[in-house]
Amino acid sequence: MENPEEAFAEDPLLRFRAQHQKRLSWMPWLYFALKPRHRSWAEAWQAEVQAALRALETVELGPGCFVAPEAAIFGEPGRGVVLGARCSVAAHAFLHGPLRLGDEVSVNARASLDGGRAGIEVGRGTRIAAGATVYAFDHGIAPDHPVRTQPVRSRGIRIGEDVWIGANAGITDGVTVGDHAVVAMGAVVTQDVPAWAIVAGVPARVVGDRRARPDQGGAPGQGFPTDGV
């Protein structure tokens, strides 16, 4: 009987596909721009990954999604995870329900989203960059008891459509981020963010408005965005 490890070592096509899968897992926006000669095997691979996830967790995955096998996605009855069409979840991202992502939402590498009890909702087309943290719960911090013994509270988080959450940014429980807003890299959002606002800093504050920066945009690209931040 042929040893699978030996066959893998001797077959350059298998080695190429394994490396290509790793590349897609860490940069999933590339999946949506695959050339036809790669799309068939990549879609078959994703069908296997997603079927295994559905069999073990309370998740709903819309058509055309990409889920890295290295991602950690956990849903329970009443605390499920729902991904709309053409969403992507990169390697080492952590998702825990209740969580609902609209169509074409991207969650990049090492981002963490936990819905607590009240849940997280993310609107269509929003980008959540690498290392971002969105936690819909917090601990009591009364001085007369250890933090570990105090109650956990959850009010929920709502993030609108076409929002960009920058790398290593944090969104705290109870916050609403309006449509088209931008949260800068490393910002910590503790209050609601208006639509179109650009916020930065710790704690985050409004530093601009997307509509006032026409020079930093451009015509929409064709298909799925190819940037990864």
Describe every region a protein language model picked out:
Residues 1-64, 125, 131-132, 138-144, ...:
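Terminal amphipathic alpha-helical/low-complexity segments used for targeting or macromolecular assembly
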Residues 44, 166, 184:
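Short, conserved clusters of charged catalytic residues that mark active-site
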